[in-house]
Amino acid sequence: MKFGVDVPTCLAGMAYPVPFATADDVVRIAVEAEQLGYDEVAGNDHLSTQRFVREAWPAAPDYFEPLMMLATIAAKTSTVRLGTGILVLPMRDPVLLAKQVATLDQISGGRVTLAVAAGGYRDEFEAVAPDLAEANRNDLMTEGIESLRVLFEQSRSTYDGKYRRFVDVESYPKPVQSPLPIYSGGNGKGAIRRAGQRCEGWLPAKIGPAELAAGRAKVHGYAREAGRDASAITIALQSVVCIADTAAQAREKFRQSTFQLFRCSLNDTMLTGVSEDQYIADSLIGTPDEVCEKVAAFQEAGLDAFSATLFVADTIDEMLDQMRLFAKYVLPAFPEGMAR
């Protein structure tokens, strides 16, 4: 089992208060994650403040561009992998994105994992890309991934899709890794299908072991239909960590944190029908022993990695304390990770 940390590139106002982290704080968290033995650090992606965040806070949050932050982190680290958790692909021009990601892979010596998804907030997408407001985002996802593949792998690239088009693009340098791992982020049918048909990994968020096992089986089914090696596809998960001395203390810490705002913002999308109690049960919330038991249950369900893990906190010091507790009690119980 491998474990990653979601550094707060674009989490203020959502999972954390406003203000929360400076750019220096984001780098400091990533450096400590490597020192603690985590396998990955990942940044999430927003280009504009979402409506629910504007309504909740009087000041606008700082959203740091994740690839630029990861480039800075690459210069301060040596072994930890650099991920996105996730990058909203429909909001990105694929030619520019391919250049940015290939450059980051070169800077880091081949440490990049690119997790992409359609994004959870329609209002943000329509604000940033109004010309694509009526576009099918599943189609945008497919065209985006296909575009990245040809740009990464062909000496000269042409792509003629419904939404994405470019002609005779010669983009160098290529990534160090071939293929550069692309994960399909999301819990829905389209994300699962793309993971099996086109990607090196599947990265859902905030689901329990049973749902993960069912999704994994579907990913493998799509892979076999496409003639791919299903066993080569990484099954990752973005989960939430809140550790305390007692289960009641952990639940109360979660309920009193800013993270509740984030959970409620997803009630009409990926968390439809998921109660607070079920959310807590599915997340890594509890005592150290309870969290280890939950990790073991996910491992039994076929999980390979906890990627872009979110640590419940209302200050940087609280976030670091949670990371340290997890590293002290959980990482040693699952020693297969690269950094351990």
Question: Residue spans of the language-model regions?
Answer:
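N-terminal beta1-alpha1-beta2 module of alpha/beta enzyme domains
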Residues: 1-76, 178-180, 339
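Flexible, glycine-rich active-site loops centered on histidine and acidic residues
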Residues: 2-21, 89-158, 206-217, 264-265
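Hydrophobic faces of well-ordered beta-strands that scaffold small-molecule active sites
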Residues: 3-7, 41-43, 82-84, 112-116, ...
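An alpha-helical appendage that flanks or caps ligand/catalytic pockets
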Residues: 7, 34, 128, 134-171, ...
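Active-site mouth loops of central-metabolism enzymes
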Residues: 9-24, 86-95, 175-187, 241-244, ...
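Conserved, mostly hydrophobic/aromatic
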Residues: 33, 37, 45, 73, ...
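Glycine-rich, proline-tolerant flexible connector loops at the mouths of alpha/beta enzymes
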Residues: 40-67, 88, 206-209, 307-323
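Alpha-helix-loop-beta-strand connector modules within alpha/beta enzyme cores
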Residues: 55-83, 140-147, 151, 320-340
